[in-house]
């Protein structure tokens, strides 16, 4: 009886520690990143205003079944692979169309957006419908809002 109680206590302590650690992580696997389109709202610490044409706003969408992400940089469509495990998020090589972007500011935004995606090492959900991408040092490189 005493051995059974000790064994139960020994096994329950690590489980409790893992549960408590997950509470502060900002990760809710019940609310996956797959599904909604994610519109870019901050690039680094710079706000990104939505454009007149929602289809041309910088955005991402993740497809769990294929392990692929797709979206728009603002001028060009893009796609690539991704893997995620807990809070880790790794985006593969990004392929993008090569359409000319008439607005130099939009072109610069797209280039910086693609660079931020390539620097991504993890993500954090920041409440309902808001996701931050972080680089390897934990610095926020981009923030998105869900568009359903």
Residue ranges of model-derived segments:
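Lipid interaction determinants
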Residues: 2, 6-11, 18-148
């Amino acid at each position: 009886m005493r051995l059974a109680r000790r064994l139960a206590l020994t096994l329950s302590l690590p489980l409790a520690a893992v549960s408590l650690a997950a509470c502060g992580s900002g990760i809710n696997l019940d609310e996956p990143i797959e599904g909604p389109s994610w519109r870019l709202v901050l690039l680094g610490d710079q706000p990104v205003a939505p454009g007149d044409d929602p289809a041309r706003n910088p955005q991402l969408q993740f497809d769990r079944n294929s392990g692929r992400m797709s979206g728009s940089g603002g001028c060009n469509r893009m796609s690539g692979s991704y893997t995620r495990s807990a809070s880790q998020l790794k985006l593969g090589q990004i392929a993008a169309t090569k359409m000319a972007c008439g607005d130099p500011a939009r072109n610069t935004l797209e280039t910086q957006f693609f660079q931020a995606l390539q620097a991504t090492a993890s993500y954090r959900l920041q409440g309902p419908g808001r996701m931050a991408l972080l680089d390897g040092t934990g610095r926020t490189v981009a923030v998105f809002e869900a568009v359903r």
